[in-house]
Design a protein with these regions (language model features):
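NAD(P)-binding Rossmann-fold cofactor-contacting core
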Residues: 151-173
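Acidic/polar active-site rim loop that often engages polyanionic ligands
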Residues: 3-5, 148-152
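Conserved N-terminal glycine/acidic-rich loop preference
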Residues: 106-128, 165-177
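Conserved small/polar residues in nucleotide/adenosyl-binding loops
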Residues: 183-190
Length: 195
């Protein structure tokens, strides 16, 4: 019987530090040619204005095979659902047996934050104490938490066109990580930067 791991389960068993170490190890194995990571396959459901993304991977060290399946349905906002949903399946690569089903969105956010921390670890100054984050959506907290593990961050600046999201992020990160300043940018102020 496969193990089912929800977001709450995963939060209890995987730390940001664990994620950084695992992702860095995965990068080393990938660079060493020990991983098989095919190009992401997508399936569009135009009639429902959605898309499914399939991302399998096999890592020879550890004999690990997993597949992430993500769906993106922008109209879910009107349904009160998240636009992005996902699951991660872990299979036994010898037998194909399903070992676990895990919340794919939490793992993706944790992995993406960890990847940013690894880039920061090797590319940023050792004494970097300020962090700038553009956008305060769901990924922002993971980025901040991971980067705070590899640098002595004392201030975080967040910019967002949604002032409520920026305030919410600022309050949470100030409580959990380090003081956060935020700036609210209205869309018309950002357009010159984009065009």
């Amino acid at each position: 019987m496969p193990i089912l791991l929800s977001r709450d389960n995963l939060k209890k068993i995987i730390t940001v530090t664990d994620a950084i170490q695992a992702v860095e190890e995965g990068f080393r194995h990938y660079k060493g040619g020990h991983c098989d990571v095919p190009v992401r396959k997508e399936m569009r459901l135009d009639e429902n204005q959605g898309i499914f993304l399939f991302m399998p991977a096999f890592m020879k060290p550890g004999n690990v095979f997993g597949t992430k399946i993500v769906s993106v349905f922008p109209n879910n906002l009107q349904r009160g659902l998240s636009t992005i949903q996902g699951v991660y399946m872990l299979n036994d690569p010898t037998t194909g047996e399903l070992l676990a089903l895990m919340d794919g969105i939490f793992l993706t956010s944790l992995r993406t934050g960890a990847a940013s921390a690894i880039a920061t670890k090797y590319l940023a100054r050792k004494d970097a104490a300020m962090l700038g984050i553009v956008g305060s959506g769901g990924q922002a907290a993971f980025q901040a938490a991971a980067i705070c593990k590899v640098r002595p961050i004392r201030e975080i600046y967040v910019y967002d066109t949604n002032s409520q999201n920026a305030r919410d992020f600022s309050e949470t990160a100030s409580r959990d990580l380090t003081p956060v300043s935020y700036t609210h940018l209205r869309a018309h102020e950002t357009n010159p930067c984009i065009s």
